């Protein structure tokens, strides 16, 4: 919507962000993405805190107020390319998306490389933009052997390329998030 794009642009400029992403919701209203946190669990690499949270039971997660900490716009380690804003010149200066990561983690890798180059500019998740997203609707889930193998190899490439980031708890959450 125009509101979401305008809000993302304003947030991006206000924080002088290198990358800005949006809170994404499943059609049911559950949280799909609210910024990505690094985890030290090698089989996951990154995850979204409060992913799957039932917003029907926790209305404050969807309200316009900021009563819940993850309902506030915040800095995070990465955002998903499902809704990501970045200046073209910044995108090109770091080489764009890594084509070795054909399906998964190319957005996370982009965020990590952007933050490495532009250390003083934050990656922001704008939670006042709530967008409904049909995760993996067009490409399907990674639920067969071939897709699972590709996902595994792409995760290993990400971890090997940015190994230093996976040796300590997530910088912005201060904890090593367990899986939900």
Indicate where each model-derived feature is located.
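Flexible loop/turn segments at secondary-structure boundaries
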Residues: 1, 27-31, 104, 110, ...
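Non-membrane alpha-helical structural segments and their capping/turn regions in soluble enzymes
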Residues: 2, 105, 148-152
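Conserved donor NDP-sugar-binding/catalytic core segment of glycosyltransferases
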Residues: 2-46, 50, 120-121
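A short, conserved alpha-helix in the catalytic core of glycosyltransferases
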Residues: 3-9, 67-95, 100-130
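Generic recognition of well-ordered alpha-helical segments
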Residues: 7, 19, 110-113, 153-161
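Generic structural signal for alpha-helix termini and adjacent loop/cap motifs
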Residues: 14-15, 100, 117, 161
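Short glycine/serine/threonine-enriched helix-capping/active-site loop
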Residues: 20-23, 126-127, 134
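C-terminal, non-catalytic tails of nucleotide-sugar-dependent glycosyltransferases
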Residues: 27-29, 40-75, 80, 85, ...
């Amino acid at each position: 919507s125009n509101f979401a794009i305008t809000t993302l642009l304003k947030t991006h400029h206000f924080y002088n962000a290198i990358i800005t992403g949006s809170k994404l919701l499943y059609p049911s209203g559950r949280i799909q993405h609210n910024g990505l946190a690094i985890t030290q669990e090698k089989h996951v690499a990154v995850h979204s805190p409060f992913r799957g949270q039932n917003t029907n039971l926790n209305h404050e997660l969807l309200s316009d107020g900021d009563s819940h900490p993850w309902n506030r716009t915040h800095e995070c380690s990465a955002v998903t390319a499902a809704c990501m804003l970045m200046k073209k010149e910044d995108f090109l200066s770091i080489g764009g998306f890594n084509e070795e990561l054909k399906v998964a983690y190319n957005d996370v890798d982009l965020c990590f490389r952007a933050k490495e180059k532009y250390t003083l500019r934050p990656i922001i998740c704008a939670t006042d933009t709530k967008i409904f997203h049909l995760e993996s609707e067009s490409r399907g889930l990674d639920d067969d052997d071939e897709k699972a193998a590709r996902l595994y190899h792409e995760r290993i490439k990400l971890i090997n390329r940015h190994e230093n980031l996976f040796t300590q708890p997530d910088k912005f959450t201060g904890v090593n998030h367990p899986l939900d």
